[in-house]
Amino acid sequence: MKKYFVVSLVKNGILGGGIVADQEAITYHTGKVTVPREYRQLVMKYDEISDATEGWLFILPTVLVKMKNGKEYKFVVFFSRKRLINTISAHGFHP
């Protein structure tokens, strides 16, 4: 079953979009044409995630997703940050 999260990617500003979580990966997507192509449909497979931690950007709740290849993606999560962490944990990664 897919789960949906309202998020913004923090990369050279705050880029609105959403995350869809399914059985294989979490996928950030946005329809904004000003966002570089590599971030418009960003697939993060659970087995490639090395860490996921909660944090803050000023007053906004965030989740930092670290990949095994060294890349990091910070997301402002507007609702249910804990549910996003739990979704990642349920698929193999445990913070």
Residue ranges and their predicted role:
Residues 1-24, 41-42, 83-90:
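Anionic N-terminal interaction surfaces
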Residues 93-94:
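Glycine-rich, low-complexity intrinsically disordered segments
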Residues 7-8, 31, 49, 76-82:
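Generic signature of intrinsically disordered, low-complexity segments enriched in small/polar residues
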Residues 67-85:
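Canonical phosphoinositide-binding patch of PH/PH-like domains
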Residues 13-14, 23-66:
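Phosphoinositide-binding peripheral membrane targeting modules
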